[in-house]
A protein has these predicted regions:
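Glycine-rich beta->alpha junctions and the first turn(s) of the following alpha-helix
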Residues: 1-84, 149, 161, 165, ...
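Active-site beta-strand/loop segments that form the cofactor-binding cradle
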Residues: 6-13, 125-128, 132-133
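Glycine-rich phosphate/cofactor-binding loops in nucleotide/flavin-utilizing enzymes
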Residues: 26, 30, 128-182
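Generic, well-ordered alpha-helical scaffold segments in large soluble proteins
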Residues: 27, 47-54, 91, 95, ...
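Short, conserved micro-motifs enriched in small and acidic residues
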Residues: 31-38, 103, 107, 111, ...
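C-terminal helix-coil-helix/basic helical segment that borders enzyme active sites and/or dimer interfaces
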Residues: 52, 56-63, 79-112, 125-130
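Amphipathic alpha-helical coiled-coil segments
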Residues: 116-124
């Protein structure tokens, strides 16, 4: 997009002149935090709640399927992953609130949360069995919707490159939470 012979009052300028791309990229990070990571945590939590209800009520061989060890393991694994992403989300938001650009941390969280959502919904399909794959239940749609989270706002592979570049520049805070506290 190009503008020629456009005049604006200084009061209409967002940020500093010549710094528009930097401002846009900084804003993108916050958008990724809210649009991808927070949504992934919220959707995964909702899916886990649905799975818990289903596991309590669906009976197989005379018992609720939630009493079966493999179902319990899937529920527990989903809860652990959701909790880890939620804590990482809060930590990253706190860094941004403190004025840190947190570019690498945002990329890490985008990958972590979007891939976590994929694993949680994959387990949900397993818990629901064949019914989870049918269009009669929302799990099938959640499964399709979860896949796009790894693509939009930058693919997981691109965000891994961003993380690695930040680490190569010396941002050990990506993997050393004690370094972040200093």
């Amino acid at each position: 997009m190009q503008f020629e012979n456009v005049e604006l009052d200084e009061g209409c300028l967002l940020g500093q002149e010549g710094q528009g791309l930097k401002l846009a990229l900084a804003t993108l990070g916050r958008v990724r935090l809210a649009q991808v990571a927070a949504r992934a945590v919220g959707k995964a939590s909702m899916i886990l709640d649905d799975c818990l209800d289903y596991a309590r009520n669906r009976r197989q061989f005379g018992s609720a399927i939630g009493e079966f060890q493999l179902i319990q393991q899937m529920l527990a694994d989903s809860a652990m992953e959701i909790n880890a992403c939620r804590l990482a989300l809060w930590q990253t938001a706190s860094r941004i609130d403190a004025g840190d650009e947190a570019r690498g941390a945002i990329s890490m969280l985008k990958v972590q949360a979007s891939e976590m959502l994929g694993r949680v919904v994959d387990r949900a399909v397993q818990i629901y069995g064949g019914a989870g794959y049918c269009r009669d239940l929302p799990i099938e749609r959640y499964y399709r919707d979860a896949r796009i989270a790894r693509i939009y706002d930058g693919t997981s592979e691109i965000h891994r490159m961003v993380m690695a570049r930040q680490m190569m520049k010396g941002d050990v805070g990506l993997f050393d939470i004690y370094e972040q506290a200093r």
